[in-house]
Swiss-Prot record:
It is found in: Cytoplasm. InterPro entries: Coprogen_oxidase_aer, Coprogen_oxidase_aer_sf, Coprogen_oxidase_CS. Substrate binds at S117, N133, T134, R135, G286, G287, N288. Its EC number is 1.3.3.3. Involved in the heme biosynthesis. Catalyzes the aerobic oxidative decarboxylation of propionate groups of rings A and B of coproporphyrinogen-III to yield the vinyl groups in protoporphyrinogen-IX. One of its GO terms (cellular component) is cytoplasm. This is Oxygen-dependent coproporphyrinogen-III oxidase. Residues 268-303 are annotated as: Important for dimerization. The active site is at H131 (proton donor). Homodimer. Keywords: Cytoplasm, Heme biosynthesis, Metal-binding, Oxidoreductase, Porphyrin biosynthesis. The keyword Nucleus does not apply. GO terms for biological process: protoporphyrinogen IX biosynthetic process.
Length: 303
């Protein structure tokens, strides 16, 4: 989807809106971390004799005089081989070669951005990998973006008819249908197009939703409507993914399943380093490199 021209100008209470968004993202982070730790505690199948994982939080600040920072929350456990739930709030100026690509930054390079980003690589190949992020960006304009997508790593489960796929899609659809500013069909298509490895001519997973540059008019509800939708995307994810994990995490798997999982993880690496907009944005804005690249899986195999 082509980047639209967004209206220039910010509301008088933009600082209050920034604070509200940041508080939401950080609260969602804490909710998800607690939910994932509970999953670690409740495992009864393979590897249940190991100690359950716990998140380790690490705060970071931007260097070289740039503003803001964030918190990395990483866990390596018996259910989640590697999961990162990160929040950041950063501000400063875009580099000259990046300004024209960002709405409202061509003539004024100042920006502020806050968001949450999550990626989970489970141990059990029966449990799909997942990615979710939502964010608010302010230049001389303002907008929300984000989404969530599911990646089953076993080919027999990587279908639209699989119960995990249908459950995930339904949760994202409900989150969209409850908000007039959201367009589920467009966001689902956008996700399918975005999370596609062109060099392999294949999808990364089974999809989900993806949206960006969400800036609704005051007549349509404005910032409040956009923020309400973004919150519901986070809530939908926090409800549906733990349910999917719990329905699969006690199942047995084979060495062949593990091999297939590691090969599928390679597709994650390829996408994130070649195409991912969030990775590029983070590196271009002086983000925390360790946090940005923490989305990469811990063990990968290429055939």
């Amino acid at each position: 989807m082509e980047r639209p021209e967004l209206p220039i100008g910010l509301p008088d209470d933009i600082e209050e809106k920034k604070a509200a968004a940041r508080n939401w993202f950080e609260g969602l982070r804490d909710t998800i971390c607690a939910s994932f730790e509970a999953i670690e505690d409740d495992l009864e199948g393979p590897l249940s004799d190991q100690e359950p994982g716990r998140f380790v939080a690490k705060d970071w600040s931007r260097e070289n005089g740039a503003g803001g920072g964030g918190r990395m929350s990483m866990m390596e456990g018996r259910v989640f081989e590697k999961v990162g739930v990160h929040t950041s709030t950063v501000y400063g100026e875009f580099a000259p070669d990046f300004r024209a690509q960002i709405p409202g930054a061509k003539d004024d390079p100042r920006f502020w951005a806050s968001g949450i980003s999550l990626i989970a690589h489970p141990v059990n190949p029966n449990v799909p990998a997942v990615h979710m992020n939502t964010r608010m960006v302010v230049t001389t304009s303002r907008w929300f973006g984000g989404g969530a997508d599911l990646t089953p790593v076993l080919s027999r489960r990587r279908t639209q008819e699989d119960e995990d796929s249908q459950l995930f899609h339904k949760a994202m659809e409900i989150a969209c249908r409850n908000h007039a500013v959201a367009d589920y069909d467009a966001y689902k298509t956008w996700c399918d197009e975005y999370f596609f490895l062109k060099h392999r001519n294949e999808a990364r997973g089974i999809g989900g939703i993806f949206y960006d540059w969400l800036h609704s008019s005051e007549e349509a509800g404005g910032w409040d409507a956009d923020f309400a939708f973004t919150r519901d995307v986070g809530r939908a994810f926090a409800m549906v993914y733990p349910k999917i994990v719990r329905s699969n995490f006690n199942k047995l798997w084979t060495e062949a399943d593990r091999d297939e999982q590691l090969i599928r993880r390679g597709r994650y690496v390829e996408f994130n380093l070649l195409y991912d907009r969030g990775t590029i944005f983070g590196l271009k804005t002086g983000g925390n490199v360790e946090s940005i690249l923490s989305s990469l899986p811990p063990v990968v195999r290429w055939p």
